[in-house]
Amino acid sequence: MKYDVILSDIAQDDLRYFKRNAPNCYKKALRLLAELLTHPETGTGKPERLRYNLAGYWSRRINEEHRMIYRINGEQIEVHVMSMRYHYVKV
């Protein structure tokens, strides 16, 4: 099954920031986004289902400082990426 990956405005800004200021994070984020197309619950970046106030969201590690936060909508076969910088502060 192939998912549509939708980036929030914040996630788009984060990706542009990585492209300008952190090329390694940019490359890793692109690899993670490519994986989300086919298997959003498994793969690299240690996918983790979040709990408590972020229940329903998933996280993947870009590096020690940054996490990709996303929500999977299986009914519409979509993955909504909420943010990519820092640890869960913009969700």
Over which residues does each language-model region extend?
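Enriched for short, Lys/Arg-rich terminal
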Residues: 2-4, 12-27, 60-67, 71-91
